[in-house]
Curated annotation (Swiss-Prot):
Residues 105-227 form the MPN domain. Disulfide bonds: none annotated. Transmembrane segments: none annotated. Belongs to the UPF0758 family. Keywords: Hydrolase, Metal-binding, Metalloprotease, Protease, Zinc. SUPFAM superfamilies: JAB1/MPN domain, RuvA domain 2-like. The keyword Repressor does not apply. PROSITE patterns: MPN, UPF0758. One of its GO terms (molecular function) is metal ion binding. This is UPF0758 protein Caur_3603. It holds the Pfam family UPF0758_N.
């Protein structure tokens, strides 16, 4: 197979050269992706390959939603390229979340959605996370507590509050996703919420809310008065 590398393009057209001259902000999504991919495929240079991948996946958001194996199966990818792309997207996601966490305290369910909605809408398993808050409702930490099917029998209260106790948090917000895409709370979700609210009172750690995320939407159990009676 003949691979066309970035350095085989005219020097003024090379994404790396343009980045050095004009800065990363001047590059298109395809040019940035081409730098990560490094080489194209037979008959397709690396910039064309990057453009094709973005078109097929629905842009950078589409690439973010693909898991590692799905990335590997895209035409022209393979394990090495998929690993580079996945790592770069994860770095970007972490930086974005860190910036949001530092910018403002949590005041509403919408603030929680700003932090986690996009990422958790597309998880293919249930994840339960806790957002740890200080006395001014600023985010201390976001912790993944469970991955897998959640019910009142397998959710251990001690695990949910473990990091909050260690960090001396004033409050927590519980967030989990429904892989089905439907965020309507189940009876199990409501029962889990009741148990956590009760435990929080004993530990003097307020459970501010429990959000369920699904397919770009979310439900606040506190707003609906479910489990916070």
């Amino acid at each position: 197979m003949i691979s066309l590398r970035i350095h085989e393009q005219p020097i003024h057209d090379q994404p790396r050269e343009r980045l050095a001259r004009q800065g990363a902000g001047a590059l298109s999504d395809a040019e940035l992706l081409a730098i990560l991919l490094r080489v194209g495929t037979n008959g397709t240079n690396v910039l064309q390959l990057a453009q094709q991948l973005l078109a097929e996946s629905g842009g950078l958001q589409g690439l973010q939603r693909l898991d590692f194996q799905e990335l590997c199966r895209l035409h022209g990818m393979g394990v090495s390229k998929a690993a580079s792309v996945k790592a770069a997207l994860e770095i970007g996601r972490r930086l974005a979340r860190s910036a949001i966490e530092e910018r403002f305290p949590i005041r509403s369910p919408a603030d929680v959605a700003t932090l986690l909605l996009v990422e958790m809408s597309h998880l293919d398993q249930e994840h339960l996370r806790t957002i740890l808050l200080d006395t001014k409702n600023r985010v201390q930490q976001i912790t993944t507590v469970y991955i897998g099917s959640l019910n009142s029998a397998n959710v251990r209260v001690g695990e949910v509050f473990k990091e909050a106790v260690r960090r001396n948090s004033a409050a927590i917000i519980v967030v989990h996703n429904h892989p089905s895409g439907e965020p309507t709370p189940s009876m199990e979700d409501i029962e889990i919420t009741r148990q956590l609210v009760s435990a929080g009172r004993l530990l003097d750690i307020e459970v501010v809310d429990h959000l369920i995320i699904g397919n770009g939407r979310y439900v606040s159990l506190r707003e609906r008065g479910l489990g916070f009676e």
